[in-house]
Amino acid sequence: MDATHRLDDLRRPCFKPNASHIRAVEKQVRVLIRRMGIRESLSIRQLVERYSQFTGTSVLLQERLLPVDCFFAITLKLTSPLDAYVITYQQATSRWHQDHGIAHELGHIISGHYDSRSGTCHFDMSAQMEWEAEYCANILGRWTYQLGRALDRTKDLRPMIPVVDASAPLRERLGWL
């Protein structure tokens, strides 16, 4: 990243979401999880694999040593085959940080930021698009954590009962990241 892009980032206007925008992103993620029919705890990486299977979109994860002044994760949309993405994430960071970067990039894909314009790169993302992707990442991270906790509790009490609605943890507003 050169100095020009860093200055452009500083000049980019701040996006302040309103309540309806927040609810729309929450609903989009909740509906997706419900439609995917997930009934077990998944890591972010497993969720990416399930998303690929559910949508027919190929999302490949690649761990690489990226320059320190670079992104922690970046998505490339491939032109062939159609609907194929490569999420490359920083190898030299913690597992949690890698998962958050992957979830952020998945948030861009879920929100359709690469579908609206061909050749969109990260420098072209608006502050609103970055907020949507970051909020998706926070929701997905919270969902995997809360669902894992809920399943651990129910497994001890009733080991044979499957979770009926895996999107239930997203309805709670307490304990958000």
Which sequence ranges carry the predicted segments?
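Active-site hotspot residues in diverse enzymes, especially metal/ion-binding acidic/histidine motifs
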Residues: 1-177
